[in-house]
Curated annotation (Swiss-Prot):
Swiss-Prot/TrEMBL catalytic activity: FMNH2 + NAD(+) = FMN + NADH + 2 H(+)
EC assignment: 1.5.1.42
Lineage: Bacteria, Pseudomonadati, Pseudomonadota, Gammaproteobacteria, Enterobacterales
Gene: rutF
Cross-referenced InterPro entries: Flavin_Rdtase-like_dom, NADH-dep_flavin_reductase, RutF, Split_barrel_FMN-bd
Record's protein name: FMN reductase (NADH) RutF
PANTHER family linked: FLAVIN REDUCTASE, FMN REDUCTASE (NADH) RUTF
Amino acid sequence: MTTPDKQTFRDAMACVGAAVNIITTDGPAGRAGFTASAVCSVTDSPPTLLVCLNRGASVWPTFSENRTLCVNTLSAGQEPLSNLFGGKTPMEDRFAAARWQTGETGCPRLEEALASFDCRISQVVSVGTHDILFCDIVSIIRHPAPQGLVWFDRGYHALMRPAC
């Protein structure tokens, strides 16, 4: 059996839908943010999630030094904000495009996020090109947006809440 090549892996991963998130930080190393879909729950006791971050990303040193982050899960209609944080736009312009509050850790929390998870990075594991950031959740804020946003098949898709 042969190991799948990089393109085959990427094409298969495009079939795996995931929530769209903006990951933010602020602290001694400065303020930064990026768009990520590589985010998932680890355990609820204690509440912990993980975020994958490429060590070659321009924001990596900032997150690495600050050791705090906020996972802001986007709702439908926030695609332009996702694109802004996913590109090469200067940080100041990224943050100017939305309304933010400050979370308990000092990280920016998106006011209109579907959910915001304010976290402290408790452990970092390096695998290949990425660091897996294990994050202890300090606080959670939810917003009653009617639709979620997922990335699937290399595009955005809205998810409706089920009717009760």
